[in-house]
């Protein structure tokens, strides 16, 4: 093989690797990780004793992850013109021209279709339909209808983001119980303070993109107060699993400790604001949800 052919082959491999990475980025893997984590926790909590069926867990995890990735790709496609105007998102594949809209749409369709097929045939139809509804809720209701029109986009659109544990629960039981809805309620209450912390230190970005996020429409002080109020609501909601005897003392201790930590962040964000601390609060909120759901799982298998 000539030196020229070797170099061409190497360049082709690099180009293929870059394209694969671009498709991977479309799925918003960090967000997807949290989605899948909460769904898997829902699967384990749904089984009163023992462990869920491993085949169901694997199939449901793959199906939910694929559809979540497809929803993220559709979000990137629909908001490509907005992403190009924002510092936080201008380096995504579509604004950079690494992928074309048509191939992004094809990728989302294949990924989502595969995920729904897996859920229908190897999990159960209820989980498939709930996952499809979640996809529509995020990619259409939130992205197209709510986000560009109302500062309450996060509050209303948070319903789709709160669905993962419900999907996991339905995957192993074939039904949606009151306990599953409690898990939904926790994420639903968590979503506004989580995203508004981000919106506070990225408010100039959102204003430049023309998106009516709360700091843009109502100002930073009102948004900081809203973060504090919703964090108080979240604290109360996280006590419900113990109050309903879904979880025990171990979870209660963890929920109270984590809740106090989140409240301290929210109070400081309100009383002594800085962009750096808003970023810190945003990051803490992600860790908070991971640890809270981990506490639910620990309490489930290690009851005191």
Swiss-Prot record:
Identification of the protein by name: Protoheme IX farnesyltransferase
Signal sequence coordinates: none
Metabolic or biological pathway, per its Swiss-Prot or TrEMBL entry: Porphyrin-containing compound metabolism; heme O biosynthesis; heme O from protoheme: step 1/1
Gene Ontology biological-process entries: heme O biosynthetic process
InterPro entries in alphabetical order: Protohaem_IX_farnesylTrfase, UbiA_prenyltransferase, UbiA_prenylTrfase_CS, UbiA_sf
Matches recorded under PROSITE patterns: UBIA (PS00943)
Transmembrane segments: 31-51, 58-78, 99-119, 126-146, 154-174, 180-200, 222-242, 243-263, 284-304
Keywords recorded for this protein, A-Z: Cell inner membrane, Cell membrane, Heme biosynthesis, Membrane, Transferase, Transmembrane, Transmembrane helix
Protein function: Converts heme B (protoheme IX) to heme O by substitution of the vinyl group on carbon 2 of heme B porphyrin ring with a hydroxyethyl farnesyl side group.
GO cellular component: plasma membrane
Organism: Aromatoleum aromaticum (strain DSM 19018 / LMG 30748 / EbN1) (Azoarcus sp. (strain EbN1))
Gene3D superfamilies (alphabetical): UbiA prenyltransferase (1.10.357.140)
Family annotation (HAMAP family): CyoE_CtaB
Compartment(s) where it occurs, according to its Swiss-Prot or TrEMBL record: Cell inner membrane
Statement: the UniProt record of this protein carries the keyword Acetylation: no
Molecular function GO terms recorded: protoheme IX farnesyltransferase activity
Gene symbol of the encoding locus: ctaB
